Amino acid sequence: MNNTPKSLRPQFLLNPDIVFLNHGSFGACPKPIFDEYQEWQRKLETRPVKFQAEEVFTHLENSRRALGEYINCDKDDLVYFPNPTHAISNLIPSLNLNERDEVLTTDQEYGACDRAWVYYAQKSGFKYIKSEIPLPITSVEEFCQQFWSKATPQTKYVYLSHITSSTALILPIDKIVKEAKVRRIKTIIDGAHVPGHIPLDIKAMDPDYYTGACHKWLCCPKGVSFLFVRKKLQEKMQPLVFSWGWGEKYNEFKASTQLHSESRFVNIFQWQGTRDMSAFLTVPASIEFQNQYDWDSVRSRCGEMVLDARNRITELTGLPKLCPDDWLGQMATILFPMDDTVAFKERLYDDHQIEISTMAHEGHTAFRISIQGYNSEADVDHLILTLKNLI
């Protein structure tokens, strides 16, 4: 099928009056996938009891199977969550960390998950230690050396992003996981921006825990994410919300329902009270949508557009790039010589209808552009012309 920006843009529900260069924040869902999402909701509302108490679990299993094939792991090592923030907040209490333990991370982590770690560190007494990653980054070796510089014999876990949210860096996770195994340290990876963005092979990477969002670059409806847990670690997992899939009476309950999974891990997290799980069921259709439109070529085109846009903007501003080209995918964070970050974002959106993500960085405004299949060269040209007028 034709996968040019001109043909893909009408497939999305995005406001045509907005130059949308912020896919990375919350994603955007194609119309066929959104239609499927609503069809699952209609099935739920047509037969609420039959669907919610019986049929949905087979559909969830099928969805997890498709996701497992896509990221190369066992479907029963996956559970769905609305977002990685939710997944990390569920995971941390199950680690049973105490005042003798340390968790090593970076200063590049996503703020919401970072807050969860800080809260539980204060509550349980473990140390949450951040390796400072100086920018610009120059090499993988430099990053790894800086990251491991704060590891100690008390480091029990490493937690870091596969792709950083604010700075859009693709971190050398395979090397970090490999070194962590040598040091006998368990790994927790936040891959919120990974599924549908860069290849993910869980078995090859072999992390202990991995969470990712499907509503970003895989283009599912909002609120579809997963948590992978290595099988031998699943018995330690406990949900924050306890419901029918948990406890000694589970087998008795299972015998009288269609709850069929043999995985305790799956059951304790699937049953979390009444909720609409329709979005979770769209994962197979989202994968198929991208296959139909040869999304590998879309990603390649978008990556080239990101690098070209970054080159043009840094030539305009004279400010340094934050990383080499091969650290980037379909996003890039770029410095801009304007002090007031809030005013910068407001002017772009209110005056020029450009949606991007902004942040402050060492006295400069920084902004992150995201290029998805529906973005055209004209979108980038409009951004750069606007930036020229703001300097």
Residue ranges: model-predicted function:
Residues 1-391:
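Pyridoxal 5′-phosphate
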